[in-house]
Design a protein with these regions (language model features):
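Beta/alpha (TIM)-barrel catalytic core signal, keyed to glycine-rich beta->alpha loops juxtaposed to Asp/Glu
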Residues: 120-323, 333-347, 373
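Active-site groove signature of glycoside hydrolases
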Residues: 102-126
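Conserved, mostly hydrophobic/aromatic
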Residues: 8, 20, 48, 61, ...
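Acidic-and-aromatic substrate-binding clefts and catalytic sites of carbohydrate-active enzymes
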Residues: 26-31, 49-59, 81-83, 123, ...
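Short, acidic/polar
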Residues: 28-40, 91-108, 154-162, 246-254
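Active-site mouth loops of central-metabolism enzymes
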Residues: 21-31, 78-97, 123, 127, ...
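N-terminal binding-site loop/beta-alpha segment at the start of enzyme catalytic domains
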Residues: 1-78, 110, 137, 143
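Short cysteine clusters
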Residues: 306-315, 355-361, 365
Length: 384
C-alpha cells in the first residue's frame, strides 16, 4: 500500500504519517543516522524531528541528507543548544542565535522547514518566549526564509493551548498516548509517568487535552506526535501504567486518530524498529484496532467517550459515525459552528440526519457512547 501523507495543519506541507525522531541516530558511532535516513527515504518517510543539539549527531544527519535534503521535512529545534559538552535548553538569545547558526552549518542546509521552539512546559516559560525575544527571533528567521514555519514542543496542554490560541505557531509537537491523555496539565513532565497517578482507576480523557486537539483542528495547527509509545513502556505489560501492553500498531493508530495529528515521530534505534513502524501502513484494521485493548485496561475506563475507533460500523445508512462525532465535538466546543468545521461536515457522503435510530451502532461500541443522541445533536447543529 505504501506510505500515507497528511496535511500538516495550514502549512501546505504534506507529512508522512510515520515520522522519525533522532533518538537512535547516535547508535553505532553515529553511523545509524545514515542507515535510518536511507531507509526512511526508500519507504517514503519524509518527516524528521531533530531535537538533539549534539554536534556529532547533527553533522552525521547533515552528511546523510547530502543529495536528498529536498526529500525531507526537517523539524529542528530552536533553543536546543550545545554548551560545555552537553545539551542545554536555553532562552538566552545569544546562545539561541549561535546554536541556530551552528545547526544550519552542521546540517549543511540553509533553511529548516519547521523551526520548533524547544520544550516549553511552564506558563511562565511561554510568557518569557513571548516577551523575551525568542518568538521575535523565530519570526525574523521566518521572514528571512531560514525557517519556513514556526512550531512549539510541549508536554503541557495548558501551555500548548496558550501557544495555539496566540496564533503565533503553525505546528505543535505534543506528547500523545492513551495514558498521557488521562492526566491533567502539569509543568513537570515526569509527573505524566508517576506511578502514584495511576494507583486509582482513571476515567476518560482529560478535558484540557481534548480541547487542545480540537482547538488545533479548528485553527489549522498541525500536531506532530512524540512519546507515542511512552518511551517504550506502553509496549510492556509490566511497565505500562495501564496494566496491559499495547502493540506498536495500536499506539501509532491511537495517535493518528486524534484530531489535527499529521505525523508520529517514532524514536527508533534500529532499522528493525523503523521497519516495524513503517509496516503500520500495510497492517490490517484488526491489527491497528486499540479498542479491545482499551476496554480490557484494568486501571482505566473510557466509558462514554468516543475514541473514533469505528467499532460502531457498519451503519445501515452508511453514516461515518466517527467523523460525525468528531465534527460534533468540534462544533459544541465553541459558541458557534466555525465555517471550516461546517465545510468538513458538509462534504461527508452521509449525514447524521439520515440516522434511523436503530441502535446497532451502540450495541457494538465498547465504550458505551450515546451514539444515537450524538446523531440527533449533530443533525440539529448542522441542519442535516
Amino acid at each position: 500500500m505504501g506510505m500515507h501523507y497528511r496535511q500538516l495543519g495550514n502549512t501546505g506541507l504534506m507529512a508522512s504519517e510515520i515520522g522519525m525522531g533522532c533518538e537512535g541516530f547516535g547508535e553505532d558511532n553515529y553511523a545509524m543516522a545514515k542507515t535510518l535516513i536511507d531507509m526512511a527515504k526508500e519507504h517514503g518517510v519524509n518527516y524528521i524531528d531533530l531535537y538533539a543539539s549534539d554536534p556529532k549527531l547533527r553533522a552525521a544527519v547533515g552528511e546523510a541528507l547530502c543529495g536528498c535534503r529536498e526529500k525531507f521535512i526537517i523539524q529542528s529545534h530552536i533553543c536546543s543548544v550545545w554548551k560545555d559538552g552537553q545539551y542545554k535548553r536555553s532562552r538566552d538569545l545569544l546562545e539561541v542565535k549561535a546554536g541556530f547558526e551552528d545547526m544550519l552549518r552542521l546540517l549543511q542546509t540553509d533553511y529548516i522547514d519547521v523551526g520548533m521552539i524547544h520544550y516549553c512546559d511552564a506558563v511562565s516559560d511561554w510568557e518569557e518566549i513571548l516577551n523575551g525575544g525568542i518568538l521575535q527571533y523565530a519570526l525574523e528567521l521566518k521572514e528571512q526564509g531560514r525557517i519556513r514555519h514556526i512550531g512549539l514542543s510541549s508536554h503541557n496542554p495548558e501551555v500548548a493551548l496558550a501557544a495555539v490560541r496566540s496564533g503565533q505557531i503553525e505546528v505543535l509537537m505534543f506528547s500523545v498516548n492513551p495514558c498521557y491523555d488521562l492526566q491533567p496539565a502539569d509543568e513537570d513532565v515526569e509527573q505524566l509517568w508517576n506511578a502514584e497517578k495511576y494507583k486509582n482507576p482513571l476515567v476518560n480523557m482529560d478535558p484540557l487535552r481534548q480541547e487542545l486537539y480540537e482547538t488545533c483542528q479548528r485553527m489549522g495547527v498541525g500536531i506532530t506526535v512524540m512519546k507515542a509509545f511512552g518511551g517504550g513502556d506502553l509496549l510492556k505489560e509490566e511497565l505500562s501504567p495501564a496494566g496491559k501492553a499495547l502493540t506498536v500498531y495500536q499506539c501509532l493508530h491511537y495517535a493518528l486518530t486524534r484530531p489535527a495529528v499529521a505525523s508520529v515521530m517514532a524514536g527508533v534505534h534500529s532499522a528493525e524498529q523503523l521497519s516495524q513502524c513503517i509496516s503500520y501502513e500495510d497492517a490490517s484494521e484488526e491489527e491497528k484496532d486499540y479498542a479491545p485493548a482499551f476496554a480490557e485496561f484494568p486501571k482505566i475506563s473510557w466509558e462514554g467517550h468516543c475514541m473514533y475507533c469505528s467499532h460502531c460500523a457498519p451503519c445501515p445508512k452508511k453514516i461515518d459515525v466517527a467523523s460525525v462525532t468528531k465534527f460534533l465535538n468540534l462544533a459544541v466546543s465553541q459558541d458557534c459552528v466555525l465555517e471550516t468545521v461546517r465545510e468538513h461536515y458538509e462534504v461527508l457522503e452521509h449525514h447524521a440526519g439520515e440516522c434511523i435510530q436503530c441502535g446497532t451502532c451502540e450495541s457494538r461500541c465498547p465504550f458505551g457512547v450515546s451514539i444515537m443522541e450524538n446523531m440527533r445533536r449533530a443533525a440539529e447543529i448542522f441542519g442535516k
